[in-house]
Amino acid sequence: MRCVVYSIAKNSPLELVKSYQKQCKRFDCELELVDLFPKNTANAQKVSKELAQKSYSLAFEPYLSPKAKNIALHPEAQRGDSFAFSKMLENHLNINFFIAGAYGFEEKFLKDCQAWSLSEMTFSHEVAKIVLCEQIYRALSIIFKHPYHK
Protein backbone atom coordinates (compact mmCIF):
# COMPACT_ATOMS: atom_id res chain seq x y z
CA MET A 1 0.00 0.00 0.00
CA ARG A 2 1.13 3.55 -0.63
CA CYS A 3 -0.42 6.64 0.96
CA VAL A 4 0.74 10.05 -0.20
CA VAL A 5 -0.26 13.28 1.54
CA TYR A 6 -0.03 16.28 -0.80
CA SER A 7 -0.35 19.71 0.78
CA ILE A 8 0.01 23.34 -0.11
CA ALA A 9 2.87 24.13 2.25
CA LYS A 10 6.51 25.13 2.25
CA ASN A 11 8.02 22.40 4.44
CA SER A 12 6.97 19.33 6.33
CA PRO A 13 8.97 16.59 7.99
CA LEU A 14 7.87 16.83 11.58
CA GLU A 15 9.40 14.34 13.99
CA LEU A 16 6.01 12.91 14.94
CA VAL A 17 5.10 12.41 11.27
CA LYS A 18 8.38 10.57 10.76
CA SER A 19 7.47 8.17 13.56
CA TYR A 20 4.11 7.40 11.90
CA GLN A 21 5.89 6.84 8.59
CA LYS A 22 8.10 4.27 10.31
CA GLN A 23 5.14 2.60 12.05
CA CYS A 24 3.14 2.34 8.81
CA LYS A 25 5.97 0.32 7.27
CA ARG A 26 5.04 -2.49 9.69
CA PHE A 27 1.88 -2.89 7.64
CA ASP A 28 3.76 -2.69 4.33
CA CYS A 29 2.49 0.84 3.79
CA GLU A 30 4.73 3.60 2.51
CA LEU A 31 3.51 6.91 3.95
CA GLU A 32 4.90 9.85 2.02
CA LEU A 33 4.42 13.60 2.44
CA VAL A 34 4.79 15.97 -0.50
CA ASP A 35 4.67 19.72 0.06
CA LEU A 36 3.83 21.85 -2.95
CA PHE A 37 4.06 25.62 -3.01
CA PRO A 38 4.47 26.86 -6.59
CA LYS A 39 5.44 30.49 -7.09
CA ASN A 40 2.04 31.28 -8.62
CA THR A 41 0.33 30.13 -5.40
CA ALA A 42 2.02 32.80 -3.30
CA ASN A 43 0.97 35.46 -5.80
CA ALA A 44 -2.57 34.10 -6.22
CA GLN A 45 -3.20 34.11 -2.47
CA LYS A 46 -2.46 37.84 -2.43
CA VAL A 47 -5.01 38.53 -5.19
CA SER A 48 -8.19 36.57 -4.40
CA LYS A 49 -9.70 33.45 -2.90
CA GLU A 50 -10.73 32.20 -6.35
CA LEU A 51 -7.22 32.57 -7.82
CA ALA A 52 -5.72 30.91 -4.76
CA GLN A 53 -8.10 27.94 -5.05
CA LYS A 54 -7.34 27.65 -8.77
CA SER A 55 -3.59 27.63 -8.03
CA TYR A 56 -4.10 24.80 -5.52
CA SER A 57 -6.02 22.79 -8.12
CA LEU A 58 -3.30 23.35 -10.70
CA ALA A 59 -0.66 22.22 -8.21
CA PHE A 60 -2.60 19.07 -7.27
CA GLU A 61 -4.05 18.01 -10.65
CA PRO A 62 -0.91 16.16 -11.84
CA TYR A 63 -1.21 13.94 -8.74
CA LEU A 64 -4.87 12.98 -9.18
CA SER A 65 -4.79 9.39 -10.34
CA PRO A 66 -7.57 7.17 -11.67
CA LYS A 67 -5.55 4.23 -10.27
CA ALA A 68 -5.66 5.64 -6.73
CA LYS A 69 -8.28 6.61 -4.21
CA ASN A 70 -8.11 10.42 -4.14
CA ILE A 71 -9.26 12.04 -0.89
CA ALA A 72 -9.51 15.80 -0.34
CA LEU A 73 -9.53 16.96 3.27
CA HIS A 74 -12.36 19.49 3.50
CA PRO A 75 -13.93 20.90 6.69
CA GLU A 76 -17.51 20.64 5.39
CA ALA A 77 -17.19 17.08 4.11
CA GLN A 78 -18.32 13.76 5.51
CA ARG A 79 -16.62 12.77 8.73
CA GLY A 80 -16.66 9.65 10.81
CA ASP A 81 -14.80 7.74 13.46
CA SER A 82 -11.55 5.83 12.99
CA PHE A 83 -13.42 2.67 12.00
CA ALA A 84 -15.26 4.49 9.19
CA PHE A 85 -11.94 5.97 8.06
CA SER A 86 -10.35 2.51 8.01
CA LYS A 87 -13.25 1.16 5.90
CA MET A 88 -12.68 3.99 3.42
CA LEU A 89 -9.00 3.03 3.06
CA GLU A 90 -9.44 -0.74 3.07
CA ASN A 91 -8.81 -2.58 -0.21
CA HIS A 92 -6.98 0.33 -1.85
CA LEU A 93 -3.32 -0.02 -2.77
CA ASN A 94 -2.73 3.63 -3.62
CA ILE A 95 -4.32 6.49 -1.73
CA ASN A 96 -3.69 10.18 -2.32
CA PHE A 97 -4.70 12.74 0.29
CA PHE A 98 -4.89 16.44 -0.57
CA ILE A 99 -4.70 19.30 1.92
CA ALA A 100 -5.47 22.69 0.35
CA GLY A 101 -4.07 26.05 1.34
CA ALA A 102 -5.82 28.66 3.48
CA TYR A 103 -8.64 29.24 0.97
CA GLY A 104 -9.67 25.61 0.54
CA PHE A 105 -10.57 23.72 -2.62
CA GLU A 106 -12.44 24.69 -5.75
CA GLU A 107 -15.73 22.80 -6.10
CA LYS A 108 -14.44 21.35 -9.38
CA PHE A 109 -11.45 19.75 -7.61
CA LEU A 110 -13.68 18.35 -4.85
CA LYS A 111 -15.79 16.60 -7.50
CA ASP A 112 -12.70 14.68 -8.64
CA CYS A 113 -12.07 13.33 -5.13
CA GLN A 114 -13.83 11.83 -2.19
CA ALA A 115 -14.02 14.60 0.40
CA TRP A 116 -13.39 13.80 4.06
CA SER A 117 -13.19 15.94 7.18
CA LEU A 118 -10.89 15.19 10.09
CA SER A 119 -12.93 17.31 12.51
CA GLU A 120 -15.34 20.19 12.88
CA MET A 121 -12.37 22.18 14.17
CA THR A 122 -9.87 24.01 11.98
CA PHE A 123 -6.26 22.87 12.20
CA SER A 124 -2.98 24.34 11.00
CA HIS A 125 -1.32 22.37 8.19
CA GLU A 126 1.17 20.91 10.63
CA VAL A 127 -1.50 19.66 13.02
CA ALA A 128 -3.69 18.37 10.16
CA LYS A 129 -0.75 16.34 8.82
CA ILE A 130 -0.03 14.85 12.23
CA VAL A 131 -3.70 13.97 12.81
CA LEU A 132 -3.99 12.50 9.30
CA CYS A 133 -0.81 10.41 9.65
CA GLU A 134 -1.92 9.14 13.05
CA GLN A 135 -5.34 8.22 11.65
CA ILE A 136 -3.75 6.41 8.69
CA TYR A 137 -1.66 4.38 11.14
CA ARG A 138 -4.72 3.78 13.34
CA ALA A 139 -6.73 2.68 10.27
CA LEU A 140 -4.00 0.21 9.32
CA SER A 141 -4.01 -1.09 12.91
CA ILE A 142 -7.76 -1.65 12.64
CA ILE A 143 -7.52 -3.29 9.21
CA PHE A 144 -4.72 -5.64 10.34
CA LYS A 145 -6.24 -6.21 13.80
CA HIS A 146 -3.23 -4.75 15.59
CA PRO A 147 -4.02 -3.76 19.22
CA TYR A 148 -2.97 -0.07 18.80
CA HIS A 149 -6.51 1.12 18.01
CA LYS A 150 -7.98 0.00 21.37
From Swiss-Prot:
- Identify the residues that bind S-adenosyl-L-methionine: A100, L118, S119, E120, M121, T122, F123
Superkingdom, natural source: Bacteria
Q: Name one Pfam family in it.
A: SPOUT_MTase
Q: For this protein, what reaction is catalysed?
A: pseudouridine(1915) in 23S rRNA + S-adenosyl-L-methionine = N(3)-methylpseudouridine(1915) in 23S rRNA + S-adenosyl-L-homocysteine + H(+)
Task: Tell me where in or outside the cell this protein is found.
Answer: Cytoplasm
> What is this protein for, i.e. what is its function?
Specifically methylates the pseudouridine at position 1915 (m3Psi1915) in 23S rRNA.
Q: How does this chain assemble?
A: Homodimer.
What protein is this chain from? Ribosomal RNA large subunit methyltransferase H
